[in-house]
Regions:
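Alpha-helix/helix-capping structural signal
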Residues: 6-7, 38, 76, 118
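Active-site neighborhoods of divalent-metal-dependent phosphate/nucleic-acid chemistry enzymes
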Residues: 69-115
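Short, well-structured N-terminal submotif of metal-dependent ribonuclease cores
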Residues: 1-35, 48-60, 126-128
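Acidic, PIN/NYN-like endoribonuclease modules and their adjacent C-terminal/linker elements
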Residues: 101, 105-135
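Histidine- and aromatic-rich ligand-binding microenvironments
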Residues: 1-4, 35-36, 93-94, 116, ...
Length: 135
């Protein structure tokens, strides 16, 4: 499953209304939890704004311990991001969301964990008819 920033942030924030279902999704997942490298940067930013440095460091400890698999974008992924951002210009699809889509396509992964229903329901991935959005 490829992870967007929203579920990760909600899982770290006990006050977030989506915390219970996002924390359960990450805790109970049987499959690999894949985090695009650009999501790491966005999560660091939002932890600093909404939570604390401790929240980010706890998450980073989990990454280092192997709870998550981090994937950097390839040149081909970035080319696909450019295609997606051009095609879905009316959605204002950002680079982070485009990189999640490109990575899911590259890995052949149908599941995306996101709280961003708008973008991920509108985009038609190349490898499946539609993403299976979690939670």
């Amino acid at each position: 499953m490829v992870l967007d920033t929203g579920p990760l942030l909600a899982a770290l924030d006990a006050a977030d209304p989506d915390h219970p279902r996002c924390a359960a999704l990450l805790t109970d997942a049987a499959e690999d939890l894949v985090v695009p490298a650009l999501v790491l940067a966005e999560l660091d930013y939002w932890c600093a704004r909404r939570l604390s440095a401790d929240a980010w460091l706890i998450f980073l400890d989990d990454v280092v311990a192997g709870a998550y698999r981090v994937e950097s974008p390839t040149t081909i992924d970035l080319s696909r991001c450019r295609e997606l951002q051009d095609r879905y210009r009316d959605l204002s699809l950002g680079l982070v969301d485009a990189s999640i889509i490109a990575l899911a396509e590259r890995l052949g992964e149908p599941k995306v964990a996101t709280l961003d229903q708008r973008h991920f329901r509108a985009v038609r991935p190349a490898h499946v008819a539609a993403f299976e959005l979690m939670p």
